[in-house]
Amino acid sequence: VLDISAATIGKIADEYYDFGEELTPNVVVTLNGKTLKKGVDYEVAYRDNVKPGTATVTVMGIDQNKGEVSSTFKILPIDITDADITLVKDTFAYTGNAINAEISKVTVKRNGTAKTLTDLTGLTYSCGGNVNVGKAFLTLTAEDGMGFANTATATYNITAASIESAEISADSAVYT
């Protein structure tokens, strides 16, 4: 019979947010210098292990083993500063009104591995500098606590309107 409450859980490395998936890192549990076995000596439960913040791991004795011990690990947000933002369209003709670009896709890196987001939950975007001819920008901003951090920017162009296909009409009048 083991008293798991006297056991030690080894340091659990920080993890990055995993796009809404539960993070369940492996743990090393020792008691009196002996490494215990998951499924034989104990079972593991996780709490608050999806969004950024502090997650809890609880190790509980099974069968005749009793007691429990807990530890924590941090879930870090994914930094979007270097995200690759692809716009549906990146060149627009001047209209005299604000022109807002639309996002086609966003690719971020988690632990150095690129991931294209299919859901932009936790991210908002706004456009600026988007009335006059020149460069306009779209800023993607991470919402607090939603898995991402910081901002990313994409630029797009507003070009002079062409008058080649313009139709001009005027009331008939005599000018002197």
Regions found by a protein language model. Give the residues of each.
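Serine/threonine-rich, repeat-prone extracellular segments and beta-strand-based repeat modules
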Residues: G33-S71, G112-N150, A154-Y156
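Solvent-exposed, low-complexity, repeat-rich "mucin-like" stalks and linkers
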Residues: V1-K34, D79-T113, T159-T176
